[in-house]
Swiss-Prot record:
PROSITE patterns: TUBULIN (PS00227), TUBULIN_B_AUTOREG (PS00228). The lineage of its organism: Eukaryota, Viridiplantae, Streptophyta, Embryophyta, Tracheophyta. Its cofactor is Mg(2+). Coiled coil: none annotated. Residues 421-448 are annotated as: Disordered. GTP binds at residues 11, 69, 138, 142-144, 204, 226. This is Tubulin beta-2 chain. Tubulin is the major constituent of microtubules, a cylinder consisting of laterally associated linear protofilaments composed of alpha- and beta-tubulin heterodimers. Microtubules grow by the addition of GTP-tubulin dimers to the microtubule end, where a stabilizing cap forms. Below the cap, tubulin dimers are in GDP-bound state, owing to GTPase activity of alpha-tubulin. It comes from Eleusine indica (Goosegrass). The gene is TUBB2.
């Protein structure tokens, strides 16, 4: 029931995805060969959200892995859980996208997309009642951004009523891997605004800060960063996979978090933050979890929620705890920080509780917030984009693949519109809306 089909694309997406499957396999007690070695029936009860049970009793992830070069795929295949994936579900090219969005979206990626869609269709047909898709990718490179958004738009055409959730790694402000990141990211956001239902925004710099400041790791590796991301990813869907007192699924999440369809870019956080291999030495309390979860330093993207206001937020608690205490703490947060929540959406924080905590913790929580301060990320990318686009720098790489400058202009203005929409709702008050409605009524009367 309620299956989720997982798709990972590009180097970043495949590395995050591989980590995510390690976490989910561990939670469900599935070993690297796909055999169940767990101890609790709860692990198997809804294992089919993410796994297909093969005839020989092995569990195979509902995962599609794609890339335009074989390198990362090979390292996934030789990694700890590499043997668990279905071999046919590795789809890769040989040429690479060379950090070029146009190659991923129009030329190299477009040649490979049909074979990816075939695998997606095959996996979707194996589902009893497909709930939606989750896509892991980065927006700075060529494959994850260009081909990732191409795949999302194709899936959107074919499965219009299924949820589309993305975990998108944005280019970070100070850490840049490639000079054309602002181009790739802007072109991708242009697509995500239209075709995705929910985007969890991540970025490496915020993750570095968490590793460095909170976890005291002196030289964080991508493995440490991906460990944080995978904890959050597992938290988002734990309600689907384990029984809970208050359940949530991808659609409930969307209904509660998205007041306006274009504003579906969320900040995510996780508490308690732990580094790989370290164990918590004392159990946290619900108030401590709540406090850590709302902390700005905990957000996995480089935008400060204190610079904006929350339109909506959702908290998913895991572990044995009293729902009453959870509700009290959530109301407490809203009362104490009421200026950070828009007053024209009352009760805008949803909470859900799942009984099974993550491995090695007694309780944990995942935070998803729809905050207007996320515009800081878009604004930053947009400024970098404009600086280069004004001089038409590096543009020949894109036009050479058949793109038109017009597409860049459109993507730029779509991004700027998004920023101003966030700003508009950040400044809106409950009273202004009343005036606005009067204007509308006036217009309707004229129209009649």
């Amino acid at each position: 029931m309620r299956e989720i089909l997982h798709i990972q694309g590009g180097q970043c997406g495949n590395q995050i995805g591989a980590k995510f499957w390690e976490v989910v396999c561990d939670e469900h007690g599935i070993d690297p060969t796909g055999r169940y070695t767990g101890t609790s029936d709860l692990q198997l009860e809804r294992v089919n959200v993410y796994y297909n049970e093969a005839s020989c009793g092995r569990f195979v992830p509902r995962a599609v892995l794609m890339d335009l070069e074989p390198g990362t795929m090979d390292s996934v295949r030789t990694g700890p859980y590499g043997q668990i994936f279905r071999p046919d579900n590795f789809v890769f090219g040989q040429s690479g996208a060379g950090n070029n969005w146009a190659k991923g979206h129009y030329t190299e990626g477009a040649e490979l997309i049909d074979s990816v869609l075939d695998v997606v269709r095959k996996e979707a047909e194996n589902c009893d009642c497909l709930q939606g898709f989750q896509v892991c990718h980065s927006l700075g490179g060529g494959t994850g951004s260009g081909m990732g958004t191409l795949l999302i738009s194709k899936i959107r055409e074919e499965y219009p009523d299924r949820m589309m959730l993305t975990f998108s790694v944005f280019p970070s402000p100070k850490v840049s891997d490639t000079v054309v990141e602002p181009y790739n990211a802007t072109l991708s956001v242009h697509q995500l605004v239209e075709n995705a239902d929910e985007c969890m925004v991540l970025d490496n710099e915020a993750l570095y800060d968490i590793c460095f400041r909170t976890l005291k790791l002196t030289t964080p590796s991508f493995g440490d960063l991906n460990h944080l991301i995978s904890a959050t990813m597992s938290g988002v869907t734990c309600c689907l996979r384990f029984p809970g007192q208050l359940n949530s699924d991808l659609r409930k999440l969307a209904v509660n978090l998205i007041p306006f369809p274009r504003l579906h870019f969320f900040m995510v956080g996780f508490a308690p933050l732990t580094s790989r291999g370290s164990q918590q030495y004392r159990a946290l309390t619900v108030p401590e979890l709540t406090q850590q979860m709302w902390d700005a330093k905990n957000m996995m993207c480089a935008a400060d929620p204190r610079h904006g206001r929350y339109l909506t937020a959702s908290a998913m608690f895991r572990g044995k705890m009293s729902t009453k205490e959870v509700d009290e703490q959530m109301i407490n947060v809203q009362n104490k920080n009421s200026s950070y929540f828009v007053e024209w959406i009352p009760n805008n924080v949803k909470s859900s509780v799942c009984d099974i905590p993550p491995r090695g913790l007694s309780m944990a929580s995942t935070f998803i917030g729809n905050s207007t301060s996320i515009q800081e990320m878009f604004r930053r990318v947009s400024e970098q984009f404009t600086a280069m686009f004004r001089r038409k720098a590096f543009l020949h790489w894109y036009t050479g693949e058949g793109m038109d400058e017009m597409e860049f202009t459109e993507a730029e203005s779509n991004m700027n519109d998004l920023v101003s929409e966030y700003q508009q709702y950040q400044d809106a008050t409950a009273d202004e809306d009343g005036e606005y409605e009067d204007e509308l009524d006036g217009q309707e009367e004229e129209d009649m």
